[in-house]
Amino acid sequence: MAINNQRIRIRLKAFDHKLIDISTQEIVDTAKKTGAQVKGPIPLPVRKERFTILISPHVNKKARDQYEIRTHKRLIDIVEPTDKTVDALMKLDLASGVDVQISLS
């Protein structure tokens, strides 16, 4: 029994781009094996957070360090998912460094 006219949208976030690419490929392979149509993965813009920290405690305002955190994002749409697709995605074990958000529409 297929879920008619529905779409599963999966958003992935991670700091490591290799980790998010591996997780994305696992999701796409799982969805295709169960007979669902997959659109994506679509790379979304990378969010860059920069922090500037003073090195010395009192003087030397010019002495600073800069750090950056990059958050990589991907979007996957699974069109016309079957019951097997939903079950397989629920059982899928992804890496711990990847944040997964799933929405049905």
UniProtKB/Swiss-Prot annotation:
Question: What function does this protein fulfil?
Answer: Involved in the binding of tRNA to the ribosomes.
Q: Which GO terms describe its molecular function?
A: structural constituent of ribosome; tRNA binding
Can you supply a Gene Ontology BP term from the record?
A: translation
- Matching Pfam families, A to Z? Ribosomal_S10
Q: Determine if Ribosomal protein is one of this entry's keywords.
A: yes
Q: How does it assemble?
A: Part of the 30S ribosomal subunit.
| Keyword Ribosomal protein on entry | yes
Query: HAMAP family in the record, alphabetically?
Result: Ribosomal_uS10 (MF_00508)
Q: What are the entry keywords?
A: Ribonucleoprotein, Ribosomal protein
Q: Which PANTHER family match?
A: 30S RIBOSOMAL PROTEIN S10 FAMILY MEMBER (PTHR11700)
> Protein name, please?
Small ribosomal subunit protein uS10
Annotated signal peptide? none
Q: Which family does it belong to?
A: Belongs to the universal ribosomal protein uS10 family.
Query: Which cellular components does GO assign to this protein?
Result: ribonucleoprotein complex; ribosome
